[in-house]
Regions:
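Coupling/hinge elements of helicase-like and P-loop NTPase modules
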Residues: 37-57, 92-104, 132-140, 273-285, ...
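ATP-hydrolysis module of ASCE/P-loop NTPase motor domains
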Residues: 63-71, 86-158, 253-336, 443-445, ...
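Conserved RecA-like helicase ATPase core segment
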Residues: 1, 394-493
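Catalytic cores of nucleic-acid endonucleases
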Residues: 225-270
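P-loop NTPase Walker
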Residues: 1-90, 375, 429, 458-461
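Conserved helicase/translocase motor-coupling segment
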Residues: 499-502
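Conserved helicase NTPase motor core
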Residues: 13-16, 21-22, 26, 71, ...
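Short beta-strand-loop-alpha-helix junction that forms the active-site gateway
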Residues: 209-236, 240, 323-327, 417
Length: 502
């Protein structure tokens, strides 16, 4: 463009995904301009520290004016500069960047980083949300059921069948055999009533284990289901020992209000009145021993927050759709998640924080609402290059389209085979269906692989051809090899790691 068509370097925008990719692009440009070959030796040197290379790269970039006039940025860095210059029309232009981790890079984004990470904020908000006892107990029940016990997998995966038949964990950590018994144990726990689960009892003739014993009421509870053994012999033993036995029945559990009332009636006149005060619960005590599981939950909140922003979905619509899901686990998760997502967004707005998705969404919003600002960028950048296009998401494509005019030239490089970030919101359809998203486009397929051997490329062809959503192409290798591919499937993660190590 610059050499043959004499295009002004300042009219070229090159967008990448990572800082490393940006540096690599700049390095290639500088190497192409450096006739001495010294710069290539510098960037490949193992004796120079990363910071030293950054400093040399900066000086070399300034040395070549045409390179310095180019705009080579990540999506986030590009949007950061837009919002710093014009963000007052959309948000607080003194915003700080909040990310998944603390940044130590020497770039614009790192200079204005928030003092806390996304994880730290959501974790803090989760603790605050758990001041609502109802929420705290729902969260603990979710973690116990679906992260600890994995009850949604018990019926289909033998790996999760416990030897003692006790699938379910109650709020106090007691393992029980059914959801109904879990309900009873949880009810007792919430009302600060001590209990013993399946105590070993011998009244006269034989040993047996009633379901629950309430010491302070000297009362036994048997929960009867269609899977229960006959109660006749047990009831006779209770009668002989003059012991108090109360039975609950499975059909009562169909109505939680009725079951609550039943348990209340059973114990109402058998315990002091102060037993019916709700137990004092707090986050630290309830989740002691479950810290890693809470971290997993927070990580899931971070993920769906990203997806909501990338897909630009109304938060309330997410919850209403989730409530219709056929799976209880999904319904329960979103009931817990959406209040936190809302609080996180409110918190960040109040603190003038923008996360990486916000940088792009706020920039697109700025362009849509302020045509004069959008036109400045449209007129400046006539030539736009996007690298790793297979990883773009909806927000990023929307931003690109807002930069285009009839005179713009868009050049995208990508490989649908390398699309691995769908879990983060990337949409491979943009490269597979490129001509529909960008009409009048010319698609060039590069089918010669210079990196891998023919055995690897051949196997890849065989695997990828099963993909439904792909660019039709046959890839060939420039390298021959006599080494065959070795397939190893270990029985555990540790075994797989050991194989790779050896």
């Amino acid at each position: 463009l610059i050499e043959e068509l004499e295009v002004s370097p300042s009219s070229i925008l090159a967008i990448t995904f990572t800082k490393n990719a940006t540096n690599e692009m700049l390095d290639r440009l500088i190497v192409s301009a450096d006739n001495t070959g010294q710069y290539e030796e510098i960037i490949t040197s193992k004796s120079l520290h990363k910071i030293e290379k950054e400093q040399i790269r900066y000086l070399q970039q300034k040395k070549y004016k045409w390179i310095d006039s180019l705009t080579v940025r990540t999506f986030h860095s590009f949007c950061y500069s837009i919002l710093r210059n014009y963000g007052v029309n959309e948000f607080d232009n003194k915003f700080k960047i909040i990310g998944d981790e603390k940044r130590d890079e020497e770039d614009d984004l790192s200079k204005n980083v928030a003092p806390e990470t996304v994880f730290e904020v959501i974790h803090k908000l989760l603790i605050e949300q758990c001041e609502d006892i109802s929420y705290l107990l729902q969260l603990k029940r979710y973690i116990l059921d679906y992260i600890i016990d994995k009850v949604h997998l018990n019926k289909t995966d033998n790996k999760f069948i416990p030897r003692d038949g006790k699938y379910y964990t109650s709020l106090d950590g007691t393992k029980v055999r059914s959801k109904s018994e879990q309900f009873i144990a949880d009810w007792l726990y919430r009302h600060s009533i001590k209990f013993v689960y399946e105590p070993l009892l011998n009244v006269k003739d034989f040993y047996f284990r009633p379901d629950f014993f309430i010491p302070d009421a000297n009362l036994y509870i048997e929960h009867v289901t269609d899977k229960s053994y006959s109660m006749a012999n047990k009831e006779e033993q209770f009668h002989l020992g003059n012991l108090l036995l109360v039975k609950t029945f499975e059909n009562m559990t169909n109505d939680s209000a009725l079951f609550n009332h039943t348990l209340d009636s059973i114990l109402k006149n058998r315990l002091p009145s102060n037993y019916f005060k709700t137990i004092s619960l707090n986050f630290k005590e309830e989740f002691n021993g479950y810290h890693e599981n809470v971290k997993d939950f927070v990580t899931q909140i971070m993920r769906i927050t990203d997806m909501i922003k990338v897909e630009n979905i109304e938060i309330d619509n997410v919850l209403s759709d989730a409530r219709k899901d056929q799976h209880e686990r999904v319904r329960n998760f979103y009931e817990l998640a959406i209040p936190l997502v809302k609080k996180y967004i409110e918190y960040c707005t109040n603190k003038s924080y923008l996360d990486f998705n916000d940088l792009i969404s706020r920039s697109t919003s700025l362009f849509k609402n302020h045509e004069d600002i959008a036109n400045k960028y449209k007129h400046k950048y006539k030539y736009i290059l996007v690298d790793e296009f297979q990883d773009v998401n909806n927000l990023q494509v929307e931003l690109i389209k807002l930069l285009l005019t009839d005179q713009s030239q868009l050049f995208c490089v990508g490989d649908d085979w390398q699309s691995i970030y769908g879990f983060r919101g990337s949409n491979v359809n943009y490269i597979v269906d490129f001509e529909n998203h960008f009409p009048n486009a010319n698609v060039v397929k590069l089918n010669l692989n210079y990196r891998s051997t023919d055995n690897i490329v051949g196997a890849s062809n065989e695997v990828i051809k099963n993909n439904k959503n792909k660019v039709e192409k046959e890839v060939y290798s420039s390298k021959k090899s006599e080494h065959k591919i070795v397939v190893f499937a270990g029985s555990s993660e540790e075994e797989n790691i050991q194989f790779c190590f050896e």
